[in-house]
Amino acid sequence: MNPLHSTQKFQGRVIRVSVDDVQLPNGLRTQLEVVHHPGGAAVVSLDAQERVCLLRQYRYVADGWVWELPAGKLEPAEPPLATAQRELEEEAGLRAAHWSSLGAIFSSPGVFSEVLHLFLARELTQARAAPEANEVFEVHWVPLQEACERALDGDIRDGKTALGLLRAAHQLRAPAHRPEI
């Protein structure tokens, strides 16, 4: 992003909000409100029975419980894979021997700069979970096919989770598309 001018309106612990003067590709000059976020990573972790680890997590902003993949924000200078590995261990108490990329997505590109990196993790082993004090969730193991059906029928409403599940199922049907990392 290269604004003509940017005015910071808010700086929080995670996000920054600015009003940017920009020139669009069609030549129009306008002001846009932008929420700057460091980005994040989410993990579709599959066990040997092709079950996925899902968190049923309380989210204040959603006013209730939401099904989500283990995920978290990128720390400064932290590669997305390292974020994914850290979050999988902290939230689910898991490590994985094999990782592959499921690509990256925008959470809401009209307003947010956040890019979410999606990963598939396999050959899981137990580790010590260390969730943050403000994280309230339950860990559930759901067959991947059932999780995809839940994403398609609207039971799973979190975008990164729904798309991560569908991309993982697609990659497993056509594994040559994404190399292991």
Task: Write out the residue ranges for each language-model feature.
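A glycine-rich, hydrophobic loop/mini-helix early in the fold
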Residues: 40-64, 68
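C-terminal boundary of histidine-terminating zinc-finger modules
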Residues: 165
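Hydrophobic residues on conserved beta-strands that form the core of alpha/beta folds
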Residues: 17-19, 31, 55, 69, ...
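Short beta-strand micro-motifs in enzyme catalytic cores
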Residues: 16-20, 65, 115-117, 138
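Acidic, metal-coordinating catalytic segment for phosphate/diphosphate chemistry
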Residues: 6-42, 48
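Unchanged
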Residues: 30, 39-42, 47, 73-159
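Generic C-terminal helix-cap and adjacent flexible tail
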Residues: 170-181
